[in-house]
């Protein structure tokens, strides 16, 4: 008998984020959609978080599954997101996906850009 140890996920997705993704996928009527989280250059702090839906998992993507939904991250973005968590919040600023990123040394006031 052999036991397979699961490696800890390099990035987490909260229940709130998973539930919102599930709702959005249901509204789109496309069960193939996955939440793609990525990093782009820009913003007041140098890097910005991006979120989009994608039907494909590309070679090298990291896949995180939670509550029946899939989040994918490309290798270049993952290096900036390791140890982080994707959440969904609703508040006075509106509703949005957010990233808690332990690698970020500074963030802007709105939380959508960061530097390392």
Swiss-Prot record:
Any stretches that span the bilayer, and where are they? Answer: none
Q: Select a single GO molecular function from the record's annotations and give it.
A: 2 iron, 2 sulfur cluster binding
Q: Which PROSITE patterns match?
A: HESB
Q: Which GO terms describe its biological process?
A: iron-sulfur cluster assembly
Signal sequence range? none
GO terms for CC? cytosol
Per the record, the similarity remark reads: Belongs to the HesB/IscA family.
The name on file for this protein is Iron-sulfur cluster insertion protein ErpA
- Specify the superkingdom: Bacteria
State where iron-sulfur cluster binds.
44, 108, 110
Does Metal-binding show up as a keyword for this record? yes
Q: What does this protein do?
A: Required for insertion of 4Fe-4S clusters for at least IspG.
Alphabetized UniProt keyword annotations:
Iron, Iron-sulfur, Metal-binding
Q: List the disulfide bonds.
A: none
Subunit composition? Homodimer.
The cofactor note from the UniProt entry for this protein is: Binds 1 iron-sulfur cluster per subunit.
Give the required cofactors.
iron-sulfur cluster
